[in-house]
Design a protein with these regions (language model features):
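Positively charged, low-complexity/disordered segments
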Residues: 2-13
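Thiamine diphosphate
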Residues: 17-197, 204-205, 210
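A broadly conserved detector of short glycine/acidic/proline-rich loop/turn motifs that flank catalytic sites
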Residues: 175-176, 199, 212, 240-241, ...
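Short, well-ordered, mixed-charge alpha-helical segments that flank or form enzyme active sites
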Residues: 94-95, 178-180, 215-216, 243-246
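Active-site/ligand-binding-proximal alpha/beta "capping" segment
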Residues: 202-225
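Flexible, low-complexity linker and terminal segments
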Residues: 58-59, 66-80, 219-364
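Short, flexible turn/loop "capping" segments at secondary-structure junctions
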Residues: 198-201, 349-351
């Protein structure tokens, strides 16, 4: 590290600044590496002839930032109002949760009290992590997990529960080579079908496909609005190349006044006024029912959350008519989702053609 900038006559303090950033909070490591760098740099400047190359400082970056997609997604989760992350480490998604933790320490600490207004749990396995996410979402928190293909396989049961009980949840799926353990360090869009139809039965889930870190940030935030509005799991489908590679991109747009869209949540005032509440009533005809959050009203708005078949008032039933009614409503909700998710990007041919190509994400 000292020889290379010494030969190329790179300004010494610039490299030292990089060391300080790399070993921030690790004073013993910083000092040892700084001494090693100085020894190599000074010896090279004294004993080695400079290369016939000239190094100039140029601003070719402009106002762009250097960021990977996973970090952008983690920041997007903060921007989207997430306060709960439960996850289990798996390549290549681990850095989504790590980035969320890093940004929460900056943006989710109460300045007056110093209290941390977030919860991040490294669970014992993927099943526990998605279970925590579903529980937090039921309780009104914006919650997510980050995983990859094998994790999605293990989370199927809880994803189905969230779908059928209609509980918001967000899953960041950073895809890798599959099937089975596959190739953890290679990119692939291997999870499209298993995520789109995760769990058994007639399940269908909205999937978002970010193309670059900017969309990782934007869709990472948007996913939480969609999950709340649709009361369902929403998947953000990154892939290894998008998530782990560093990109040059324009600064993200951050609006402190951005309002969170919580969807159809009944207030205590509405319940007190005697408004009819049935957890699975399709009042508006769009398939999306109204929900209440625990503790909203002392006497009204309570219901059983079930993974079993139920009627419009969340009462257990195995009657065929009630089951068909519920499934048809879920289909209407999925149709309503089509108007809420981002549309496709269409590049039209310069001349009329009979062929078309369909691809997903930057390496599709």
């Amino acid at each position: 590290l000292g020889v290379d900038p010494g030969v190329r006559r790179i300004i010494k303090t610039k490299t030292e600044a990089m060391l300080v950033e790399q070993y921030k909070g690790k004073a013993p490591l910083l000092e040892a590496n700084r001494q090693a760098f100085r020894l190599g740099y000074d010896w090279t400047r004294e004993h080695v002839e400079p290369l016939g190359l000239k190094v100039e400082r140029r601003d070719c970056v402009g106002d762009r930032i250097f960021v990977d997609g996973n970090s952008a997604a983690g920041l997007g989760a903060v921007y989207g109002g997430a306060t709960v992350c439960a996850w289990y480490p798996i390549t290549p998604s681990t850095s989504v949760a790590e980035a969320f933790m890093r940004y929460c320490r900056k943006f989710r600490v109460d300045k007056a009290t110093g209290k941390h207004r977030y919860a991040i749990v490294q669970a014992e396995d993927e099943l526990a992590s998605i279970g925590m996410v579903v529980g937090a979402g039921w309780n009104g928190a914006r919650a997510f997990t980050a995983t990859s293909g094998p994790g999605i396989s293990l989370m199927q049961e809880f994803i189905g529960l969230a779908y059928f009980a209609e509980i918001p949840a967000v899953l960041f799926d950073v895809q890798r080579g599959s099937p089975s353990t596959g190739m953890p360090t290679k990119t692939q869009q291997a999870d499209l079908l298993c995520s789109a139809y995760a769990s058994h039965g007639d399940t269908k889930h909205p999937l978002l496909f970010p193309e670059d870190p900017t969309e990782c940030f934007e869709m990472g935030a948007q996913a939480f609005d969609l999950a709340d509005r649709l009361q369902t799991p929403v998947f953000v489908m990154l892939e290894l190349d998008t998530g782990m590679q560093d990109w040059l991109t324009a600064p993200f747009r951050w609006d402190d006044s951005r309002a969170l869209d919580r969807g159809k949540v009944m207030s205590a005032e509405e319940l007190e006024a005697g408004r009819d509440f049935g957890r699975y009533l399709d009042v508006d005809g769009d398939g999306i029912p109204y929900r209440t959050l625990p503790g909203t009203h002392p006497r009204r708005g309570a219901y059983f959350t079930r993974g079993t078949s139920k009627d419009r008032y969340a009462r257990y039933t195995e009657e065929g008519a009630a089951y068909v009614d519920n499934m048809q409503r879920l289909l209407r909700k999925f149709e309503s989702a089509k108007a809420l998710v981002p549309g496709p990007v269409i590049d039209r041919a310069a001349k009329p053609t009979r062929a078309a190509a369909v691809w997903i994400a930057p390496t599709g």
